């Protein structure tokens, strides 16, 4: 009995856990710059080619090379702008009606007669039948209505080049306002030909696109149920 009371008390305590103790009274921390690009203590990117140096007494000025160079991102380390303009609407209305009725009658009959030593005869009829009936009904209805409108721009960096020339890009943006941190991430594979002349690309041109827009902080924690309640929801059969 004492163990049961202790278990119930522990569950109630877990239901009140809504935030991590180390985050109480603190604003969410920003991620390190270029954390996913392998940035070291010194400002150098691993695996990226170094910028060519300027030759002494050269007739060609490196500052003039951009006039003839394609401004679009093409090699690891280049930056391009991803334009996200999502305006999706979905209305789904599903209804199912299922009914099954099954009936069955199983029977049998017979007659018998017996005689005894005295010559007296006895007889009778036997009739046995079994009736079965089964009725099953199921009704379901579901309605989904969604509306999303997201318009953002984020700078992404080319992290790698595939053998066929396609580019792998990844971008991240974090903005902290008071104690709430807005996080925007984008990643995917793009074709160089889809990058426009002003070095921008639309989100619908990104293959294997991974776009996330959310946040973390006090407001996000309030919108989520406490950890204890989430555990109860996972194990509760009701």
UniProtKB/Swiss-Prot annotation:
Main location class: membrane
GO MF term list: cytoskeletal motor activity
GO term, biological process aspect, one: bacterial-type flagellum-dependent cell motility
Covalently lipidated residues, kind N-palmitoyl cysteine: 17
Lipidation, S-diacylglycerol cysteine type: 17
Membrane protein topology class: Lipid-anchor
Record-stated family: Belongs to the FlgH family.
Oligomer and partners: The basal body constitutes a major portion of the flagellar organelle and consists of four rings (L,P,S, and M) mounted on a central rod.
Name of the featured protein: Flagellar L-ring protein
Designated gene of the protein: flgH
